[in-house]
Curated annotation (Swiss-Prot):
Catalysed reactions, semicolon-separated: (S)-2,3-diaminopropanoate + fumarate + ATP = N(3)-fumaroyl-(S)-2,3-diaminopropanoate + AMP + diphosphate
Known role: Involved in dapdiamide antibiotics biosynthesis. Ligates fumarate and 2,3-diaminopropionate (DAP) to form N-beta-fumaroyl-DAP. Can also form N-succinoyl-DAP from succinate and DAP, with lower efficiency.
GO biological process, one term: antibiotic biosynthetic process
Top-tier EC class: ligase
Protein name: Fumarate--(S)-2,3-diaminopropanoate ligase
PANTHER family, A to Z: CAPSULAR POLYSACCHARIDE BIOSYNTHESIS PROTEIN
Statement: the UniProt record of this protein carries the keyword Ligase: yes
């Protein structure tokens, strides 16, 4: 199905059912009305772990596969794109980036770590006619700085946590005309600070929203001052308590569900992203419905985003193996994950064992720490009264 085509939900669900028999069975079990989105089952992490991420998927056509960090099973996720999925993704990202950048930019650099966006960034910029430098995330941070200062890109595509680390060195000596961000939550205040640092306007910073499962999802529309969903994505935002009945969240946000009409080789029908979204709205623009939101507060429930994702199940397992029966919560400090544990003291060997277990399950994070792109994992002792919330159930 092509982007912008009038999309028939029932036909699309039938296509997904034909590709994924387990999903067809799910529809039969639920007795779902295929023409009503709200009647369709939710695609959760649990279902995908059982049927997709580690399954021997068989597809009728050529495909591309990408790995991301571990799930509750301890294995890395594998996500598939058909040739058509890939084509639509590349075209959509290129259209957004080209519209943002305009003409006259000849050099582009991507420093994105791992994943689908990192693997395709070079192709997008080359199609725009740019000379391209792709920085290998395994390089030490000094080499990232050397490439940037030598190449002096007009367009710099990176992740907020990487950019923070680069700026903190005080050694950057280039002035990009456009900065494109992807990955971590980048508040407008944070974007403004980045613009000030590089002596550019806030409108010259573009924040993209995407995931390896869906691909391109949304972008910050400076004219609207809101994030705008891509045209082939049908978003829903549902109350937190509808998915997590025990949650005590009382804010204005809700959990984002996504249905994509541009993903043949992923069951993107009411996919539970676990992203907490505020200010969700829709309006009619030129005869078509446009969906927008004010901001993403981060990831709710089972994952703590640390560039890639360090799964809360991994953290729970590491603590259970090495320091059981202690309350804990999580924080960020200087680009690194902090695990705050209710304890008077923790032996050094226990701290190292916890970190070893986490990094063994998340090798991409281990490499990024080694390269100096993100801060090391810290274990901090605190009084039990300082522990905030039950992170085994939620995190945002």
């Amino acid at each position: 199905m092509n982007k912008g085509e009038n999309m028939n939900l029932e036909m699309w669900v039938q296509n997904i059912s034909a590709t994924f028999p387990w999903y067809a069975q799910l529809l039969r079990d639920k007795q779902a009305d295929l023409s009503r989105l709200e009647s369709l089952p939710l695609i959760t992490e649990e279902l995908l772990t059982q049927h997709y991420y580690h399954a021997e998927n068989s597809f009728p056509g050529e495909h591309h596969s990408y790995l991301t960090s571990g799930t509750t099973s301890g294995k890395r996720k594998r996500i598939f794109y058909s040739d058509n999925d890939q084509r639509i993704y590349l075209q959509q990202r290129m259209d957004i980036i080209r519209d943002f950048c305009g003409e006259g930019h000849t050099r582009a650099c991507a420093d994105l770590g791992t994943g689908h966006a990192a693997a395709t960034a070079g192709e997008i910029f080359q199609a725009m006619g740019c000379d391209v430098e792709l920085i290998d995330f395994t390089r030490p941070i000094e080499q990232h700085i050397e490439v940037l200062n030598r190449f002096k890109p007009d367009i710099f595509f990176t992740m907020p946590m990487i950019l923070d680390s680069l700026i903190a060195t005080g050694k950057l000596d280039f002035q990009p005309k456009r900065i494109i961000l992807l990955g971590d939550v980048a508040s407008l205040n944070w974007q403004n600070k980045v613009a000030d640092y590089f002596h550019i306007q806030p409108a010259q910073v573009l924040d993209l929203f995407g995931s390896i499962e869906i691909g391109s999802i949304a972008f910050y529309n400076h004219a609207q001052k809101r994030y705008q969903f891509d045209s082939y994505v049908r978003p829903e935002v549902v109350p937190v308590q509808s998915l997590y009945p025990g949650a005590k969240y009382g804010g204005d946000g809700g959990i984002l569900l996504l249905t994509s009409f541009a993903r043949e080789y992923f069951p993107a029908v009411r996919f539970v992203t676990n992203d907490l979204i505020e200010g969700f709205a829709q309006e009619n623009v030129g005869g078509r419905t446009v969906y927008t939101y004010q901001r993403c507060l981060g990831r709710f429930a089972g994952e703590f985003k640390h560039g890639e994702k360090i799964n809360l199940s991994d953290i729970s397992d590491a603590l259970a193996n090495n320091l059981p029966y202690h309350k804990y919560d999580l924080a960020d400090h200087e680009g690194g994950l902090v695990i705050r544990i209710a304890a008077k003291s923790i032996p050094t060997e226990v701290i190292e064992a916890i970190k070893h277990d986490l990094l063994a399950r998340n090798p991409d994070i281990a490499q990024m720490i080694s390269s100096g792109l993100v801060g090391d994992i810290r274990i901090q002792c605190v009084d039990a009264q300082e522990i905030t919330g039950n992170v085994s159930k939620r995190r945002y």
